[in-house]
Swiss-Prot record:
Keywords: Ribonucleoprotein, Ribosomal protein
Family annotation (NCBIfam families): rpmF_bact
HAMAP family, A to Z: Ribosomal_bL32
GO cellular component, one term: large ribosomal subunit
UniProt family annotation: Belongs to the bacterial ribosomal protein bL32 family.
PANTHER family: 50S RIBOSOMAL PROTEIN L32, LARGE RIBOSOMAL SUBUNIT PROTEIN BL32
Statement: the UniProt record of this protein carries the keyword Ribosomal protein: yes
Protein name (database record): Large ribosomal subunit protein bL32
GO biological process entries: translation
Region listing for Disordered, in residue ranges: 1-23
Species of the source: Natranaerobius thermophilus (strain ATCC BAA-1301 / DSM 18059 / JW/NM-WN-LF)
């Protein structure tokens, strides 16, 4: 079995784990109704996406 030759330092471990932090979602404004929505998603309040009505709300 493979075994590490050197011990991984605390700093190196922490640097690697720093990439796994949770980030707050970024919201954008819907151009139709001005509500906050996630980017590249259908607006939940008006049902528009890329200027077209996808679902009737």
């Amino acid at each position: 079995m493979a075994v590490p030759k050197k011990r991984t330092s605390k700093t190196r471990t922490n640097r690697r784990r720093a990439q796994k932090k949770a980030r707050a979602p970024q919201f954008v404004e819907c151009p139709q109704c001005r509500e906050k929505k996630l980017p590249h998603r259908i607006c939940q309040s008006c049902g528009h996406y890329k200027g077209e009505e996808i679902i009737e709300v």
